[in-house]
Design a protein with these regions (language model features):
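Conserved subregion of the PPM/PP2C metallophosphatase catalytic domain
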Residues: 1-137
């Protein structure tokens, strides 16, 4: 995944090759699920050019990127953490208005607890917030 945020305008551009879509969270609600990847993972050998996905962020928007190791993290009973639980936990944690690193830390701990503290797959979380337009140079 490659993402670029224009800090002056809030324009987010994303290319993904096999990772799940990102989520845009605004005022406590998921307002956009970024479209799924258009290119296959690099390791599959088939080369399709990725499509650049663009999203206009508003000041205060949060964006959550994650790998499938997050949503597929299984409990002892085999129940996946899932997208719904990911969204619910993230939205509730963001409502606590803690710094984003603390919110991400709590999310990772919730995922680890769900799978009895045994990491079963790659599990990456990136959480960002666009606060306001950057000043012109």
């Amino acid at each position: 995944m490659l993402a670029e945020l224009d800090q002056r305008t809030g324009r987010l551009r994303v290319i993904s090759a096999g990772h799940p879509s990102g989520l845009v969270i605004r005022r406590g609600k998921v307002v956009t699920v970024l479209p799924p990847p258009t290119a296959l993972p690099v390791t599959l050998g088939e080369h399709r050019p990725p499509v650049v996905i663009e999203e206009a962020l508003e000041p205060g928007d949060d964006v959550l990127f994650y790998t499938d190791g997050i949503t597929e993290a299984g409990s002892r009973d085999g129940e996946p953490f899932g997208v719904d639980r990911l969204i619910d936990f993230t939205v509730r944690a963001l409502a606590d208005d803690l710094p984003l690193p603390e919110t991400a830390r709590r999310l990772v701990h919730a995922i680890l607890a769900h799978q009895d503290n045994r990491l079963q797959d790659d599990a990456t979380v990136l959480l960002l917030r666009w606060i306001r337009p950057a000043p012109e140079e």
